[in-house]
């Protein structure tokens, strides 16, 4: 609990950790790095006595456990890819903050090329497949010419009348898979990829780029990590920027793209 962390009850927390069995779930109510340091001290003591744990955490946990010092935000120098091709930004999130960030990003029209992925093609026979093919072809031409491409899904929500929640979910998954496949079908290596949205960025990394192992380079902005893709991935040695949907200010996406193009 937060009280145990605040009074620095390392021994008491360690005893709780030692008593956990059969994949018991342990929830840590830490609200600061100071709280996390207390918990990690107890965790290390428990691990030294032979206990093993599987952690599902945010980045703060690995920072404290690894005793990683604060690092400056990454800049253009560290994010330069090994190609003169343009980059690609893929925006799948529909939350209001993402839409506001997209509208702000459009101020770079002329410096980047914007392409809207028509999600309503999901209702046409082979519509999504054709839309993916169209988008990939156009994007590759721009990337090869050194231009950065911004691909975003139509902002309207598709919710036809009389459609069940299960049917809506099925459509949502089909669209999400189609959007992710754009990266998977690219035959040219972009100098960077930015994926916007929690599900979008996860699927692009694991499914489209087939990343099994990556080096975490740091953050380009607060809460926005950057991977350097591994040798086994579709595009080895490329900066991959993971931008969750509800993170950043209205201008954050524009600032990142502006620095990279």
Please place each PLM-identified region on the residue numbering:
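General beta-strand structural signal in soluble alpha/beta enzymes
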Residues: 1-2, 26-30, 53-58, 63, ...
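Cap/lid and interdomain-hinge subdomains that line or gate substrate/regulatory clefts
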Residues: 1-36, 261
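Residue-level preference for the first positions of well-ordered beta-strands
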Residues: 23-27, 52-54, 86-88, 146-150, ...
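Active-site pocket-lining segments that scaffold enzyme catalytic pockets across diverse folds
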Residues: 24-28, 32-36, 40-50, 56
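Catalytic cores of soluble, metal-dependent hydrolases
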Residues: 45-48, 62-63, 134-141, 149, ...
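Short, flexible loop segments at boundaries between secondary-structure elements
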Residues: 57-84, 218-240
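A glycine- and small/hydrophobic-rich beta-loop-beta segment
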Residues: 78-87, 91-177
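Active-site histidine-anchored catalytic micro-motif
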Residues: 189-190, 195-198, 202-250, 255
